[in-house]
Amino acid sequence: MGYIDKRRDLLMDFNQLVLTINGFLADKLLVFALVGVGLWFTINLGFIQVRGFGEAWRRTFGGMFKKSGKAGADGMSSFQALATAIAAQVGTGNLAGAATAIAVGGPGAIFWMWVSAFFGMATIYAEALMAQKFKKVGDDGTVTGGPAYYIRAAFPNGFGKVLAVIFSVLITLALGFMGNAVQANSIADAFKTAFNIPPLVVGVVVAAIALFVFVGGIGRIASLTEKIVPIMAAFYIVGSLVVIIANGKYLGTAVASIFIGAFKPEAVLGGGFGYIISRALSKGVARGLFSNEAGMGSTPHAHAVAKVDHPAEQLSLIHI
């Protein structure tokens, strides 16, 4: 029993250490670093998320009705890259992020999520720019790129390589385990609650569908996302509007409570925390249209392989 008790105490101490570190990073350092970086990019890029918004909408809707070329190892079209990036942003995380923000900081936390998202648009613009600029084209025409590539370019010595490796390991863990697990669990819970289908069955079906897509490589991923994402986004927006309209009599009160509560200390904390939760959870086939994973380093991989004559062509879509 002594050995078991010591092992249990050790695990509890380790868990407390993780919670302490996570609390410091999520509640203090990371939140303000992300907003600070976004603010810096916003100022230095001349409020690009405002200046380029009209062009982004024009090119996005134009791309929805324009036939894209076949994606392959040499890359994908601008719209396919955008759809792939959005598919990595829309989903469970947005709902959980907003709910967590409200629970922690009250209605005012939503305002700070808006602020985080606004400045995050400039951060994503910078991420996509660097991904396009520092992407690599192999002798066989294969295109690769992403944060690991521009991290190495920023630090051309051995330190850059070490940072790139660390980033690659961490992003693999975040995207390959945490994000996918949350999405699959949400799907399984929904089917269990609505249709009483065992989670194991749902898990097997989800895994089979994912395998089918992955086996097809970048071509199948791009082809699927460019078809599904517009429909998914439409359902997301229409569903949100239906909820708002159905509760229209409370809209004025809700908006007022958001702005009134926005400048309470607990609201500021809650908004940042909810935003981080939203980014952490939003990985999988579908994620949140209004949560952008700014600074996480996930979406640049999609933008890096866009086949464009000039990086500006892809960057004009980023604000969506």
What is each residue range found by the language model?
Residues M1-L11:
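Short, Lys/Arg-enriched N-terminal segments with co-localized hydrophobic residues
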Residues L11-T92, A103-A109, G120:
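N-terminal alpha-helical transmembrane segments of multi-pass membrane transport
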Residues L29-V37, S77-G93, L163-A184, P198, ...:
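Hydrophobic, membrane-embedded alpha-helices of multi-pass small-molecule transporters
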Residues L34-W40, L45-W57, F167, A184-F191, ...:
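Membrane-interface loop-to-helix entry segments
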Residues F41-T42, S116-G141, R152-N185, D189-V213:
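Helix-loop-helix module between adjacent transmembrane segments
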Residues A56-S68, K136-A154, I258-F263:
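Juxtamembrane inter-helical linkers in multi-pass membrane proteins
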Residues A101-A109, K135-G145, P156-G158, A294, ...:
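Juxtamembrane helix-boundary/capping and inter-helix hinge elements in multi-pass membrane proteins
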Residues I318-I320:
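Conserved small/polar residues in nucleotide/adenosyl-binding loops
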